[in-house]
Curated annotation (Swiss-Prot):
UniProt-listed HAMAP family: CitD
Parts of the chain that traverse the membrane: none
Origin species: Edwardsiella ictaluri (strain 93-146)
Record's protein name: Citrate lyase acyl carrier protein
Intrachain S-S bonds: none
Complex and partners: Oligomer with a subunit composition of (alpha,beta,gamma)6.
Superkingdom in the source lineage: Bacteria
NCBIfam families: citD, PRK13253.1
The organism's taxonomic lineage, starting at the top: Bacteria, Pseudomonadati, Pseudomonadota, Gammaproteobacteria, Enterobacterales
Subcellular location: Cytoplasm
InterPro entries named in the record: CitD, Mal_deCO2ase/Cit_lyase_ACP
Function in brief: Covalent carrier of the coenzyme of citrate lyase.
Length: 99
C-alpha cells in the first residue's frame, strides 16, 4: 500500500488511541514512535499489533506516531486500518484480501 500524504485517526480520550502517519523519503524505512499510558504492561503487544497491521498491508516508507491511552487491541487495529485508508486515499478497504 502506498501512503500518499499525512493522515490522522483516533482521539486522545481514555481507552482510545490517536495514530498519525506521514510518508518519508526512504521508501523502505519505518520510523515508529509509540507512547502509551500502559506501555510498561502492554508496550510489546502494542508494537506487535502495529507491525502486524503494517506488514499485512505492506506499508513502508513512513513515519508512524502512536499515542495510546489504553485502547484495546481491536480499537488499535481499527484505527490503524482507518489511518492507512485515509493516507492512501482508498475509498474502501480490501476486505477480501485479509487473512
Amino acid at each position: 500500500m502506498k501512503i500518499n500524504h499525512a493522515a490522522v485517526a483516533g482521539t486522545l480520550e481514555s481507552s482510545d488511541v490517536m495514530v498519525r502517519i506521514a510518508p518519508i523519503e526512504d521508501d523502505q524505512a519505518l520510523d515508529l514512535q509509540i507512547s502509551s499510558s500502559v506501555e510498561k504492561q502492554f508496550g510489546d503487544a502494542i508494537r506487535a499489533t502495529v507491525l502486524d497491521v503494517l506488514n499485512r498491508y505492506q506499508v513502508r516508507g513512513i513515519q508512524l506516531i502512536v499515542d495510546d491511552k489504553g485502547a484495546l487491541d481491536c480499537v488499535l487495529r481499527a484505527r490503524l486500518e482507518t489511518l492507512l485508508a485515509r493516507a492512501a486515499d482508498l475509498v474502501s478497504l480490501p476486505w477480501e484480501d485479509r487473512a
